[in-house]
């Protein structure tokens, strides 16, 4: 984790190293730029070059050992610190149920559960989840025994092309836990969700981070609502 934070800091330094060396702090009594400004940035180009070189070195840091707990199984890996959780799942472990859509955290196709909380796997580094419990769509059910949410998506035709479905299902499973915990959303009146108050608008709000280009939203909402009613 320390290496990751150092990587962020030095990468940012390298990226913005062409910023003006002085900021406008006003003139001193002699009419020259204030001496305060000279302390803001390094005094010579050599120090900037050294910072760039150090940042580049960390961007190509050697592979590090890592243990990921995925769907109840431990995986001991050795990967570069810059590898995202999404790429570790798909490219290293072959768990291709988690989809790469926008790769920018906007579509939700890569949604997985980490310690029960839904996250976008494309926006987080694998190194940040050492030892944590990760659940992908492959871990929700078994062949012939799908998770109730998976079954509901099939029964309600909650998909068309199916590319976004793994992320939709993982997000919907997390939604069930949120409802049980009575967690509020942006639409909830009050600090807690009242029993039986999960409306279609609430479902749409809670699923707004998962996009479907095919437009299967009505059936997705129907599928989620059916599971909530059965578990009530």
Regions found by a protein language model. Name each.
Residues 1, 13, 40-41:
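Short hydrophobic transmembrane-like helices used for membrane targeting/insertion
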Residues 2-5, 19, 26, 30-33:
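Short, low-complexity intrinsically disordered segments enriched in A/P/G/S/L with frequent Arg
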Residues 7-10, 48:
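Leucine-biased recognition of intrinsically disordered, low-complexity hydrophobic segments
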Residues 12, 30-33, 225:
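Amphipathic alpha-helical interaction segments
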Residues 22-23, 36-232:
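Signature of N-terminal electron-transfer/Fe-S-associated modules in redox systems
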């Amino acid at each position: 984790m320390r290496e990751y934070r150092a990587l962020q800091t030095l990468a940012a330094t390298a990226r913005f190293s062409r910023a003006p060396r002085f900021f406008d702090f006003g003139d001193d009594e002699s009419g020259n730029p204030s001496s305060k400004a000279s302390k803001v940035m390094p005094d010579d180009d050599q120090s900037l070059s050294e910072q760039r070189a150090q940042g580049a070195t960390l961007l190509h840091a050697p592979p590090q050992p890592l243990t990921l707990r995925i769907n109840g199984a431990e995986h001991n890996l050795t990967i570069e610190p810059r590898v995202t959780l999404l790429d570790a799942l798909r490219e290293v472990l072959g768990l291709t149920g988690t989809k790469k859509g926008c790769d920018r955290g906007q579509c939700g196709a890569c949604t997985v559960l980490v310690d029960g909380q839904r996250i976008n796997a494309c926006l987080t580094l694998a190194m940040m989840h050492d030892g944590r419990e990760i659940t992908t769509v492959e871990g929700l059910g078994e062949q012939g025994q799908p998770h109730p949410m998976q079954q509901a998506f099939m029964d309600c035709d909650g998909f068309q092309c199916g590319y976004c479905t793994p992320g939709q299902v993982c997000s919907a499973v997390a939604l069930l836990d949120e409802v049980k915990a009575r967690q509020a959303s942006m639409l909830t009146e009050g600090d807690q969700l009242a029993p039986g108050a999960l409306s279609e608008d609430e479902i749409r709000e809670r699923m707004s981070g998962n996009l479907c280009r095919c437009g299967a939203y009505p059936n997705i909402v129907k599928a989620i609502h059916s599971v909530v009613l059965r578990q009530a």
